[in-house]
């Protein structure tokens, strides 16, 4: 039983049958605490010199230009940045579905891709390019995927140090930084897709559809169509003129009613009354004579 236990302890990784024997150090190329910190940054913008941009996904209309900036999270005099492959897909995973390839091997794979000069001549840790977001995918949210790695800057001091230092048993070292024209000429070696130095960064893009402009009116050829000026907005009325207009309308209505009353009073026929009496100066009726016995004669 004791022998079996000792054999199991000897086979366990990280343990030794002899006490006091130090553990083997990790290889320099093995993953360590430095991988927890971000090494690169990928930013998008709708203008060439609008870096850094506000937080949040980029929102651009379809068939417009998108500007990309890839940079090292911490600039270093020894390390530079190299772009290997960039593509646009409708999925957040770069390996699923169709893709619009923009860069392949660090060189433009689309006609609309153009590299911009770095913000400073000595800024080897920043790489900028732009492309036209063609309406290839029917998706409102698309994703830009870029494979980025670090590269060694050219330095004579660094080359002498490499020659004097023995080569350890580590993964392949990063490539040397080369200018864009020299890298696309085929003079540089490309990293494999499973290289530990490659890092994939993804940024979302919100694609909007612009509204169509109104069609111009038909006109005779050779005549320029001038746009109609916009109608002036009605001015707000002040309260004083409104009150004056109301009072004037009231007075005018009262005067009109009074005038109509006078006209009706003078043009109406007189009311019927008793028959007129006979005048004293006119002929009077004579009574018949009365006799003594009270009879008329």
UniProtKB/Swiss-Prot annotation:
Residues 268-277 have a biased composition (Pro residues). Coiled coil: none annotated. GO terms for cellular component: plasma membrane. Disruption phenotype: Females show no effects on puberty onset, estrous cyclicity and body weight. They have increased litter sizes relative to wild-type with normal litter frequency. Females ovulate more eggs in natural cycles with increased uterine implantation sites. They have increased numbers of antral follicles and corpora lutea. Double knockout females for TGFBR3L and gonadotrope-specific TGFBR3 are infertile. They have increased serum follicle-stimulating hormone (FSH), pituitary protein content relative to controls. They have larger ovaries with increased numbers of antral follicles and corpora lutea. Pfam families: Zona_pellucida. Disulfide bonds join 86-146. Residues 50-157 form the ZP domain. Residues 1-17 form the signal peptide. This is Transforming growth factor-beta receptor type 3-like protein. It comes from Mus musculus. The gene is Tgfbr3l.
């Amino acid at each position: 039983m004791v022998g079996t236990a000792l054999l199991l302890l000897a086979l366990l990784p990280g343990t030794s049958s002899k006490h006091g024997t130090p553990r083997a150090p990790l290889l320099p190329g093995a993953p360590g605490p430095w991988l927890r910190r971000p090494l690169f940054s990928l930013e998008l913008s709708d203008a060439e010199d609008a870096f850094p941009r506000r937080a949040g996904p980029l929102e651009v209309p379809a068939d417009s230009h998108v500007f990309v900036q890839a940079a090292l999270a911490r600039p270093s005099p020894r390390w530079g940045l190299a772009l290997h492959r960039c593509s646009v897909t409708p999925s957040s995973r770069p390996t699923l579905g169709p893709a619009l390839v923009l860069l392949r091997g660090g060189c433009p794979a689309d006609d609309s891709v153009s590299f911009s000069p770095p913000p400073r001549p000595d800024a080897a840790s920043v790489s900028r390019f732009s492309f036209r977001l063609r309406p290839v995918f029917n998706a409102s949210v698309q994703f830009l995927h870029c494979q980025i790695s670090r590269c060694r800057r050219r330095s004579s001091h660094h080359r002498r140090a490499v020659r004097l230092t023995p080569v350890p048993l580590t993964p392949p070292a990063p490539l040397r930084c080369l200018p864009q024209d020299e890298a696309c000429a085929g003079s540089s070696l490309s990293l494999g897709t499973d290289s530990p130095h490659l890092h994939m960064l993804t940024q979302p893009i919100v694609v909007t559809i612009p509204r169509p402009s109104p069609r111009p009116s038909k006109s005779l050829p050779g005549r320029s169509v001038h746009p109609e000026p916009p109608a002036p907005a009605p001015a707000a009325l002040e309260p004083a003129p409104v009150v004056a207009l109301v009072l004037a309308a009231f007075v005018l209505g009262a005067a009109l009613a009074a005038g109509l009353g006078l006209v009706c009073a003078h043009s109406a026929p007189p009311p019927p009354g008793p028959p007129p009496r006979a005048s004293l100066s006119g002929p009077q009726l004579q009574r018949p004579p009365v006799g003594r016995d009270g009879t008329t004669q």
